[in-house]
Swiss-Prot record:
GO biological process: base-excision repair, AP site formation via deaminated base removal
Top-rank EC class of the record's enzyme: hydrolase
Organism taxonomic ancestry: Bacteria, Bacillati, Bacillota, Bacilli, Bacillales
Superkingdom of source: Bacteria
Protein name (Swiss-Prot/TrEMBL): Uracil-DNA glycosylase
Gene source species: Bacillus mycoides (strain KBAB4)
Gene behind this protein: ung
Amino acid sequence: MENILQNDWGPLLGPEFEKEYYQNLANFLKEEYEEHVIYPKVEDIFNALQYTSYENTKVVILGQDPYHGPNQAHGLSFSVQPGIKTPPSLLNMYKELRDEYGYEIPNNGYLVKWAEQGVLLLNTVLTVRQGEANSHKGKGWEHFTDRVIELLNEREKPVIFILWGRHAQAKKKLITNTSHRIIESVHPSPLSARRGFFGSKPYSKVNTILANMGEREIDWEIPNL
């Protein structure tokens, strides 16, 4: 799997692939992919890191584990493949975006446009069994994605971390470099969005920070497909 990382994440994360926890994880995944339906496809597991290189990462939106329905997950947190109905949390993200910028809600949940602009759409667990949320929790992915966050924390150039909900906010302890910025609220899930996600203006906050740093702002508008 380490050969998949073809950009600057490769040498940074290379040592992880040699560690015992990752060897155990790789063995577990081999069996899981052989015996069960696992999402995303093997070739999509590291898409977040593929689309958004270490040096190009401006923003991190931290998710939990991949969508576990057919053909949804493709390696980017909150994003779904073209032709798949937009999930409820992402729909709420779009509603907040509409309220902030006036953008129409698109007919898809394909967030590659964000990833290509430097928004790292990272789940803390990168695989899941079909229909079984959190089924790959505690198998080693958390060590790996914690290392991703630690590496970004070590970077001199500031990163904006968007932490929605308690699960994401638990990673705040890894962000110790005071040059980085943290934007947090409750999760956009329908269960919590009205308790402080709606009206939190995360997208314009990101762009204000980027503009103040002299960086290109993110074009958050997702086009219809």
